């Protein structure tokens, strides 16, 4: 990775923390610039600050956590932060008991075997002394939680059924949304199988900003706050988003500076050519960023965090997406269900 990809217009820039020569900036180059040491510390502080906001680990008996690794730069950063925090011997130590979950979306056997081989290499660098499990998103199709096996891809026998289910969805927008919901369902079932109630995911600020706009377009505007917050409680399961304040740019720079940018897993994903709300949202945000509206994502997330649903105050939630609703199922999920020829109620029961 080229150093010049992360630096521009350095003339006269000084670090906002220590007044050394500045070399790196976050999302908006018009704002704060940092020297290398202060930039690394700033990124670490954002990660730790997100976890401390909700006092997620205040109870000693609820520290078991599923840490998701998806092969992305954000996933590598998350592993690095957990690994580093557990090595601390002072008050800075993160009181968490991690289990690493490698989440696979590849469907071909040779690619899955390559992932398993690569994971064995990556494990030597991060969290070597904790349990690692590999699972395909198709694990969500199991009727009941099942025992996970190490050193192999769990859920692989359900891949054909998973592909058939997605193919049965006739509307590209709803197919994308179904994929997202199946992924969350998969994480919940995996957590149940491991008897864990918390799950750290790799969603960063860029991912969440796009998600917020997607959900607004899909009619879930009243539930945006719960979908982008750092901790989302769902009955006996909690989704934790510790990267919610960090952009992909900040994460990529950090990984480069800390020399962990060679611990990714390259997947051969083919970009879908189907037009959908999600692809249009992504194109819209990219256009704004190209036109130097750097704060678009931050503005979206800041606004989304203030929007709360007035329905479902009695604790009722949609059976598929878990947003607060007054009915058994939200209108968006009803539309997703109707666009599929397969019965989704069995999966999301």
UniProtKB/Swiss-Prot annotation:
Pathway: tRNA modification; 5-methoxycarbonylmethyl-2-thiouridine-tRNA biosynthesis. Pfam families: CTU2. It comes from the Eukaryota. Transmembrane segments: none annotated. GO terms for molecular function: nucleotidyltransferase activity; sulfurtransferase activity; tRNA binding. GO terms for biological process: protein urmylation; tRNA thio-modification; tRNA wobble position uridine thiolation; tRNA wobble uridine modification. SUPFAM superfamilies: Adenine nucleotide alpha hydrolases-like. InterPro entries: CTU2 (IPR019407), Rossmann-like_a/b/a_fold (IPR014729). Keywords: Cytoplasm, tRNA processing. It is found in: Cytoplasm. The keyword rRNA-binding does not apply. One of its GO terms (cellular component) is cytosol. Belongs to the CTU2/NCS2 family. Plays a central role in 2-thiolation of mcm(5)S(2)U at tRNA wobble positions of tRNA(Lys), tRNA(Glu) and tRNA(Gln). May act by forming a heterodimer with tut-1/ctu-1 that ligates sulfur from thiocarboxylated urm-1 onto the uridine of tRNAs at wobble position. This is Cytoplasmic tRNA 2-thiolation protein 2. It comes from Caenorhabditis briggsae.
């Amino acid at each position: 990775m080229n150093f010049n990809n992360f630096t521009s217009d350095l003339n006269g820039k000084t670090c906002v923390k220590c007044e050394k020569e500045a070399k790196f900036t976050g999302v908006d180059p018009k704002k704060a610039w940092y020297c290398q040491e202060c930039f690394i510390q700033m990124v670490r502080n954002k990660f730790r600050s997100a976890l401390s906001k909700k006092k997620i680990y205040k109870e000693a008996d609820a520290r078991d956590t599923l840490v998701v690794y998806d092969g992305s730069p954000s996933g590598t950063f998350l592993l690095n932060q957990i690994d580093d925090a557990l090595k601390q011997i002072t008050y800075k130590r993160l009181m968490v008991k991690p289990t690493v979950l490698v989440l696979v979306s590849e469907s071909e056997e040779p690619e899955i075997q390559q992932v398993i081989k690569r994971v064995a290499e990556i494990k030597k660098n991060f969290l070597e002394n904790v349990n690692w499990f590999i699972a395909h998103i198709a694990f969500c199709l199991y009727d009941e939680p099942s025992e996970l096996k190490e050193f192999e891809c769990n859920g692989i026998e359900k891949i054909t059924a998973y592909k058939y289910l997605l193919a049965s969805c006739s509307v590209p927008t709803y197919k994308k949304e179904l994929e997202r919901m199946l992924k969350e369902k998969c994480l919940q079932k995996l957590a149940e199988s491991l008897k864990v109630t918390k799950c750290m995911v790799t969603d960063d600020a860029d991912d969440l900003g796009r998600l917020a706009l997607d959900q607004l377009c899909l009619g879930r505007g009243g539930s945006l706050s719960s979908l982008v917050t750092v901790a989302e409680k769902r009955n006996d399961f909690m989704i934790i988003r510790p990267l919610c304040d960090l952009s992909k740019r900040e994460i990529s720079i950090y990984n480069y500076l800390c020399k962990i940018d060679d611990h990714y897993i390259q997947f051969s994903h083919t970009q879908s050519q189907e037009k959908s709300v999600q692809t249009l949202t992504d194109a819209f945000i990219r256009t704004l960023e190209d036109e130097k509206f750097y704060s678009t994502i931050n503005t979206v997330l800041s606004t989304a965090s203030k929007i709360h649903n007035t329905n479902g105050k009695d604790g009722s939630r949609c059976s598929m997406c878990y947003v607060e609703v007054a009915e058994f199922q939200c209108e968006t999920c009803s539309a997703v269900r109707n666009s599929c020829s397969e019965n989704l109620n069995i999966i999301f029961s």
